[in-house]
Design a protein with these regions (language model features):
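Proline-aspartate-enriched helix->loop->beta-strand connector
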Residues: 93-114, 119
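Histidine-centered beta-alpha loop that forms part of the nucleotide-sugar donor binding/catalytic region
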Residues: 111-112, 139-141
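Short Gly/Thr/Asp-enriched flexible loops that form oxyanion-binding sites at enzyme active sites
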Residues: 117-129
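Residue-level signal for the nucleotide or nucleotide-sugar donor/cofactor binding architecture
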Residues: 17, 117, 158
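Short beta-strand segments
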Residues: 41-43, 108, 137
């Protein structure tokens, strides 16, 4: 008996605060779905206060290329890092315009369990801007507190490898524990175990919109 719930979106948006957030939270899923659906990846800040982070935007583009996302589908905004709470209205208007232009059927963004001020602001404004749209939350290990995935999506070994390769493009962060490939793989294995699958990407459900379809 098939116990999987199938879901699909013709247009799927991934929205993160900073370069690397989307890949950490959903890189394997992106690799899995990008051949089959239109994916848009939006990072709201290219403005990194730390001068040691001057290369992260270029690393982000290379990372997305590894995942198979076309360059024209990778958007990087200009909001100032660590100042998102002070730009809520501007972020909301930016996201509303994004919704009008792209009209995603599913949106992935930061989990509500994320305690980074920029990440939390993005989540709140995504929920306001994309009313009537399914929204799922991804985990960024370094800044989450109490995240537990209740929506698990099976991915393959190939997807896992692509996620690891994508994160390896961030030479800026190669010594950071949250970029350790063993931790990344272990997280995918753990989420897979929760789903009784070899690997899974894990999310929490911020909003689910659906129609129950009966098979004939």
């Amino acid at each position: 008996m098939n116990r999987d719930m199938s879901f699909f979106g013709r247009r799927v948006a991934f929205i993160g605060a900073h370069p690397d957030d989307i890949e950490i939270g959903a890189g394997a899923l992106i690799a899995h779905i990008v051949p089959h659906t239109e994916v848009l990846c939006v990072t709201l800040s290219d403005n990194q206060k730390n001068p040691d982070l001057k290369n992260v935007v270029h690393e982000h583009y290379r990372s997305m290329e590894v995942l198979g996302v076309p360059r024209q589908q990778v958007v990087v905004g200009t909001f100032e890092t660590r100042r998102f709470p002070h730009a809520r209205q501007e972020i909301l208007e930016y996201l509303i315009q994004l919704n009008r232009e792209f009209m995603p059927e599913i949106v992935f963004t930061h989990t509500r369990a994320d305690i980074h001020q920029d990440h939390a602001t993005v989540t709140e404004e995504v929920l306001r801007a994309f009313r009537g749209t399914t929204v799922l939350g991804f985990d960024v290990l370094r800044s989450s507190y109490g995240f537990f995935p209740n929506f698990l999506v099976e991915v393959t070994e190939e997807d896992v490898q692509k996620k690891l390769q994508a994160l390896a493009q961030y030479k800026t962060y190669e010594t950071k524990y949250y970029f350790n490939p063993d931790i990344t793989r272990s997280t995918l294995i753990r989420h897979g175990a929760l789903a009784e699958r070899p690997y899974a990407e894990g999310f929490d459900t911020l909003r689910i919109i659906g129609v129950f379809a009966c098979s004939s």
